[in-house]
């Protein structure tokens, strides 16, 4: 009997050990020396669901260009909590965590699996285990799946471990953390759809930073802090401070700003606070009136240290949302109503730091030396990581709008450009409608660029465009079938950023309307000479021309001189530089 009992207990121990091992990552099993391939994500996703069917759902939310499934784990305390419609109905807060948007920066994948396993096997802090009673966790281990499988030892030369890792960009060479607004990649289309489905209160994007060598192991950067509704900003700030305090208690050396020197390789130049444009994950969440958190573990820490830091950021966030998330979730719905009624309010589109306000901070760095370089022909910096130092450096804390506009009633898109605009609106889950009745001639605002400049080189598959100018009132014909996008909806801030032409992440800035800024008809020089001779008989034109000749750039350019007269001729294309979107300040019937 005793022998039989030993056999049973031994079998149970093997089952428990085997089960636990089956849920561990390659990173855990190799003591944080290696990270697994994507097949491990597939296996673990299904293994967690099999062992904890009431608590985990392994979902596929898209397919990559190379044909791989994009996986997410939904984790909650009950089967109902795994359903997005239930979470919305019960106002259950959702915490969204993604790893591997840059697949070489893969800490988030292993951190998330580690924390989920410990929670479900009751190895985590009891408060963290209980957090799932109040919160649904949606975890995407690897966003950039194809990039993850471009595995290699030399993909991250500025990073310590793991032994091999994935690549920064996708198989189509998109940097996904520049794609949130333009939604070019199949991966981003799938991700935005997932965000629309779950509507998380907060989303964490887990990265590894490059940059200088210093002692701090993790940074968190939040949005929105300097724009949007006051209550949402306060929510983001409170979460930030609570997470930082939690990390300090656990022995981490966290930062609440992005640790990039104002001048490259010059530690004494210090740091500043900033605002992430909505092309970035945290900025995108911010303009959706949600909280976005960028997590940057420090690349020069070993992999074990970095993964632990990422894990603890997620854990602290879960604890905070478990405590306050239900109240915040109810509040955010009320705030969405306020976002829908911001017509006429001024809002920043781009921001910069003022030099007026700064504070001296104690930054934990290392001794360094700057000297001339025979290689680059300039200076180089050398860090001595065995000689820790405390740097006294400035942190510039005042952030001010650089470009601002007032939120209008809405935007009208003529039929001719809807094939460009509609897919973007649908991707973001923005409401719009076709104008059915004959509106006829109506006074709207149009934007005709005073000047415009194309980017000198391609960026993320686009030739960017910068414009100057102002909206001006003009009467135009509004036709049935034209598109109306009202800002009286919860995604008003997102709409505002998409359509305001001077915004850094507007559809115009990304080059979607470049054809409207390309000259397609011309006047021969000899014809222009004849036209100019006649025009110069007009004293007013002659006076303006002679004034412009005092500008050396104009005086020395035959092209600019001839164009001056061509622009005054009736044959000049009046649609050149005309933004093909109208702005309205009154409700459309």
Where are these regions (language model features)?
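Structured catalytic-domain cores with a bias toward divalent-metal coordination
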Residues: 4-6, 17-589
């Amino acid at each position: 009997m005793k022998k039989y009992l030993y056999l049973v207990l031994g079998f149970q121990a093997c089952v428990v050990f085997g089960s636990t091992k089956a849920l561990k990552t390659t990173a855990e099993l190799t003591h944080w020396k290696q990270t697994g391939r994507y097949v491990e994500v597939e296996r673990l996703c299904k293994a967690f669901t099999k062992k904890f069917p009431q608590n985990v759902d392994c979902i596929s939310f898209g397919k990559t260009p190379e044909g791989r499934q994009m996986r997410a784990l939904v984790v909650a305390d009950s089967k109902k909590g795994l359903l997005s419609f239930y979470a919305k109905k019960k106002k259950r807060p959702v915490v969204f965590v993604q790893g591997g948007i840059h697949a070489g920066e893969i800490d988030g994948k292993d951190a998330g699996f580690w924390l989920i396993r410990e929670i479900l096997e009751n190895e985590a802090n009891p408060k963290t285990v209980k957090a799932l009673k109040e919160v649904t966790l949606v975890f995407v281990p690897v966003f950039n799946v194809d990039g993850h499988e471009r595995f290699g030892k030399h993909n991250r030369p500025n990073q310590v471990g793991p032994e091999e890792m994935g690549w920064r960009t996708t198989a189509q060479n998109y940097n996904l953390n520049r794609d949130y607004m333009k939604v070019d990649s199949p991966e981003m289309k799938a991700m935005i759809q997932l965000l629309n489905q779950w509507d998380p209160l907060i989303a964490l994007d887990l990265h590894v930073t490059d940059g200088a060598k210093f002692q701090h192991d993790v940074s968190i950067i939040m949005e929105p802090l300097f724009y949007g509704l006051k209550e949402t900003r306060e929510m983001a700030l409170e979460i930030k401070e609570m997470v930082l305090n939690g990390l300090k208690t656990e022995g981490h050396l966290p930062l609440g700003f992005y640790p990039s020197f104002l001048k490259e390789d010059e530690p004494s130049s210090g740091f500043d606070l900033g605002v992430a444009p909505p092309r970035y994950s945290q900025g995108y969440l911010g303009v959706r009136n949600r909280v976005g958190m960028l997590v940057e573990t420090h690349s020069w820490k070993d992999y074990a240290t970095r993964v632990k830091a990422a894990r603890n950021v997620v854990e602290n966030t879960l604890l905070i949302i478990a405590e306050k998330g239900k109240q915040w979730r109810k509040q955010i719905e009320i705030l969405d109503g306020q976002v829908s009624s911001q017509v006429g309010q001024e809002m920043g589109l781009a921001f910069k730091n003022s030099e007026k306000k700064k504070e001296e901070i104690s930054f934990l760095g290392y001794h360094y030396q700057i000297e001339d370089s025979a290689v680059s022909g300039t200076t180089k910096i050398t860090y001595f990581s065995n000689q820790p130092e405390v740097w006294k450096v400035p942190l510039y804390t005042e952030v001010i709008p650089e470009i601002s506009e007032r939120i209008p009633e809405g935007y009208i898109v003529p039929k001719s450009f809807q094939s460009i605009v509609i897919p973007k609106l649908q991707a973001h889950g923005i409401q719009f409608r076709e104008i059915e009745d004959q509106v006829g001639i109506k006074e709207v605002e149009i934007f005709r660029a005073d000047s415009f400049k194309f980017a000198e080189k391609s960026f993320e598959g686009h030739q960017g465009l910068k414009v100057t100018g102002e909206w001006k009132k003009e009467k135009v014909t509004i036709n049935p079938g034209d598109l109306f996008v009202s800002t009286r909806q919860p995604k008003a801030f997102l709409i505002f950023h998409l359509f305001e032409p001077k915004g850094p992440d507007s559809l115009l800035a990304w080059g979607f309307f470049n054809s409207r800024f390309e000259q397609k008809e011309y006047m021969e020089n000899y014809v222009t000479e004849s036209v100019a001779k006649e025009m110069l008989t007009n004293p007013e034109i002659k006076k303006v021309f002679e004034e412009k000749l005092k500008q050396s750039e104009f005086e020395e350019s035959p092209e600019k001189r001839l164009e001056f007269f061509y622009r005054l001729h009736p044959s000049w294309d009046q649609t050149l530089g005309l933004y093909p979107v109208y702005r309205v300040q009154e409700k459309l019937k």
